[in-house]
């Protein structure tokens, strides 16, 4: 098979579909790999490293797409890439089409065979190709949330941890899946008081066994419970995911009116349409906006902020496929 790895073109997206180590494994099985020039340069993967691994370097995306039978990417194609898609090409990447039906229609119109990382499901119901990026996004959500709580970022001007007799700040995590669990882990490491909200009592019980009771509160999801929790929170993490579907809008515009000015909301679910009614996609260049004095962070490719870690983690799980 002829495999192509184009450069990512989404805003501040520095991940790459294959590492040189992955290329070496694929080539050893008799396949041909074309990599676009400097596709991995920003994370230290030079053209020479790919050549030594057995890849051939091509200069343009047009060349990569025209030569390949299988395209391996990280993020969904953007408008400028649709021209390269065709009915005898297979695309293997994150697509997150549930929140963007127009993009789904455009992909269908090209005839391309598209396989979404995030919907590949194991026999046990887990999503092995989504999990590592969800975990990274969960950790990043606390990092960027804490940063945007700083006063010069329009936040409250607080640190989420406790200091001596100063009570810890409140972090609410909505959704107890992979991303939510990692966000909880990071928040507890920073000595925050964490409120966890989930639809499943069984999931809440599992999380309680994992994290205990100290500085933790476990809340069964309902509109009233969500409203009450976020009204006293300093940082709210939205980590809701429904396989292949648009994220439900669980925090309404009306709820924002009860929140304190400078509260930060991080919507990890934004690549599935967002789980806050007030959310809209943002970029690493311009990541935040205010609604009712509540700061929203809605970057659609959060793991792109740590591209080397994310690329290595992604390749570890995608290579077997």
Label each residue range with its predicted role.
Residues 54-67, 218-229:
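Short acidic low-complexity segments
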Residues 31, 86-89, 110-112, 260-263, ...:
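A short helix->loop->beta-strand "cap" motif at the edges of active sites that frequently abuts
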Residues 118-159, 270, 275-321:
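Adenosine-phosphate binding glycine-rich loop
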Residues 66, 70-148:
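Phosphate/diphosphate ligand-binding glycine-rich loop within oxidoreductases
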Residues 209-292:
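Rossmann-like adenosine-cofactor binding region
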Residues 12-17, 80-84, 93, 243-251, ...:
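Glycine/threonine-rich flexible loop motifs
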Residues 6-7, 11-45, 152-238, 288:
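Glycine-rich phosphate/diphosphate-binding loop of Rossmann-like nucleotide-binding domains
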Residues 69, 75-76, 95-96, 222, ...:
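Short glycine-/small-residue-rich Rossmann-like dinucleotide-binding loops
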């Amino acid at each position: 098979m002829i495999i192509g790895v184009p450069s990512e073109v989404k805003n501040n997206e520095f991940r790459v579909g294959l590492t040189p180590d992955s290329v070496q494994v694929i080539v050893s099985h008799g396949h041909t790999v074309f990599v676009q020039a400097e596709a991995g340069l920003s994370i230290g993967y030079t053209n020479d490293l790919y050549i030594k691994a057995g890849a051939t370097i091509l200069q343009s995306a047009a060349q990569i797409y025209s030569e390949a039978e299988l395209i391996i990417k990280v993020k969904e194609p953007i408008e400028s890439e649709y021209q390269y898609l065709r009915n005898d090409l297979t695309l293997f990447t994150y697509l997150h089409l549930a929140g963007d039906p127009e993009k789904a229609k455009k992909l269908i119109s090209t005839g391309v065979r598209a396989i979404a990382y995030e919907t590949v499901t194991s026999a046990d119901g887990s999503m092995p190709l989504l999990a590592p990026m969800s975990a990274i996004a969960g950790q990043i959500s606390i990092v960027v949330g804490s940063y945007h709580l700083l006063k010069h970022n329009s936040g409250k001007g607080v640190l989420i941890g406790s200091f001596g007799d100063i009570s810890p700040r409140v972090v609410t995590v909505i959704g107890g899946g992979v991303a939510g669990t990692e966000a909880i882990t990071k928040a507890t490491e920073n000595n925050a008081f964490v409120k966890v909200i989930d639809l499943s009592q069984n999931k809440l019980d599992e999380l309680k066994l994992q994290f205990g009771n100290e500085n933790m509160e476990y809340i069964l999801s309902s509109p009233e419970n969500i409203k009450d929790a976020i009204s006293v929170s300093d940082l709210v993490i939205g980590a809701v995911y429904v396989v292949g579907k648009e994220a439900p809008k669980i925090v309404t515009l009306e709820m924002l009116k009860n929140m304190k000015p400078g509260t930060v909301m991080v919507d990890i679910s934004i690549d599935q349409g967002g789980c806050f009614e007030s959310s809209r996609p943002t970029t690493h260049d311009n990541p935040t906006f205010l609604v009712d004095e509540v700061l929203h962070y809605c970057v659609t490719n959060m793991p792109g902020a740590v591209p080397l870690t994310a690329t290595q983690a992604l390749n570890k799980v995608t290579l077997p496929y």
